[in-house]
Amino acid sequence: MNQYKNFIMQFEDIVGNNNVLIDEPMKKHTSFKVGGPADLLITPTTLEQVKDSIILCRNNSIPYYIIGNGSNLLVRDGGIRGVVIKFLKLGDIKVEVDRVIAQSGAPLTNICNEALKSNLGGLEFACGIPGSVGGAVTMNAGAYNGEISQVIESAKVIDKDGNVFLLNKEQLDLGYRMSAIQKYHYIVLEVTFKLHNSEYDTIKNRIMDLNRRRTEKQPLEYPSAGSTFKRPEGHFAAKLIEDTGLKGKSIGGAQVSEKHSGFIINKGGATAGDILNLIEFVQNKVKEKFQVDLHTEVRIIGEENN
């Protein structure tokens, strides 16, 4: 049993007995399908439970990690010491005139579909992004010339001391794959998007077109975390990797996708170690050839295997 067993009952008091898992394999909770066990994994069902869980962790010096859909996450093979707070059950979405308000765990696809039903445009670019809205805002996710920064109005967040407050668009300070949320280690609880009225068919056709392009160009048939690397200034990561001759390069079960060099995929039976070794190999080779540093877009957490 792990060192946090003494807190199991306290977490169960907060989130309920059925929402606390012990030594939970993180490969069940990430799109890469890899990762060792988390000491505890809890799934709060209300924002108040999130706040109480964070305060319990803070007061007892328990490390904690927030995850949504696990789609931009790589957990090392040794797993996670401490508590994973998964926002899976915090997915409420409501539409108020031209605004869509969503809890942090709501999948982007669900939010896009609610906007579509209400003839609200602006989020079409996000419909194929597999993550939840909390993670999307934290990293200012984007695709096909669209970014969260273009449509967000505000975000309700919580800090490490359990204080809840609202950040407007300016305070969120959204840049390329960055935000004030990352900088100050805030956690997103709820997001308000301001959209525009549009025709149902116009929105639907745009979504279908972007999803068709994704399917044609991206290795969606394999586990991955989407684009592995951020776009280096003045370059495209996929082109640098391809021009280095690394398309199809494998280490263990991890491979640089033959369909899109910007994706590292789990071809089958990969470990987190395989993926991390391949990431480092690609970074080194691209640096040698082009003197360009590739930085990961995927979030990497957890312990190495002993």
Swiss-Prot record:
Keywords: Cell cycle, Cell division, Cell shape, Cell wall biogenesis/degradation, Cytoplasm, FAD, Flavoprotein, NADP, Oxidoreductase, Peptidoglycan synthesis. The active site is at R177, S227 (proton donor), E297. Its main location: cytoplasm. GO terms for cellular component: cytosol. It is an enzyme of class 1 (oxidoreductase). It comes from Clostridium botulinum (strain 657 / Type Ba4). PROSITE patterns: FAD_PCMH. GO terms for biological process: cell division; cell wall organization; peptidoglycan biosynthetic process; regulation of cell shape. This is UDP-N-acetylenolpyruvoylglucosamine reductase.
